[in-house]
Amino acid sequence: MFQGETAITVDDKGRMAVPTAYRDLVARVSGNRLVLTYNPFEAGCLWLYAEKEWERVRDDVMSKPNTQRVVRTLQQKLVGSSAVLELDANGRLSIPASHRNAVGIEKKAVLLGMGDKFELWSEQAHRALIQQTLSDGDLGDELLDLRL
């Protein structure tokens, strides 16, 4: 569904323009609404889901018993901190200040299309991610035969 990397500028009001290549798709699959939440696995990154896909993720996460701290933390970061955003007439999303501040997004960010969701990275965190290299030891057996 979504793929590619786009440099994003965030204005003083916390608005970012969704790339024009994605606007029709977002309108079609999600009625111009995306759900924003924290990436619980990597610092410096937010996730943006189309509403239907978000509902699947939310329901799956909330179906887990919250008797373990890791499950409660996941539920808090994903569901408790989520926000429904709507594209304005100019194709922009207003990213809440709390989310921007938590992941270090200021003026520059990077939007990655990751299939069923977007990842919105602070420019600094994205640069650090790209500079990391993977070794064979980092890959599980199921990925060793992947042909890239």
UniProtKB/Swiss-Prot annotation:
One of its GO terms (cellular component) is nucleoid. Belongs to the MraZ family. Its main location: cytoplasm. Forms oligomers. GO terms for biological process: negative regulation of DNA-templated transcription initiation. The keyword Protease does not apply. InterPro entries: MraZ (IPR003444), MraZ_C (IPR035644), MraZ_dom (IPR020603), MraZ_N (IPR035642), MraZ_sf (IPR038619), SpoVT-AbrB_dom (IPR007159), SpoVT-AbrB_sf (IPR037914). This is Transcriptional regulator MraZ. It comes from the Bacteria. The lineage of its organism: Bacteria, Pseudomonadati, Pseudomonadota, Gammaproteobacteria, Lysobacterales. It is found in: Cytoplasm, Nucleoid. Signal peptide: none annotated. One of its GO terms (molecular function) is DNA-binding transcription factor activity. PANTHER family: TRANSCRIPTIONAL REGULATOR MRAZ. Residues 5-53, 82-125 form the SpoVT-AbrB domain.
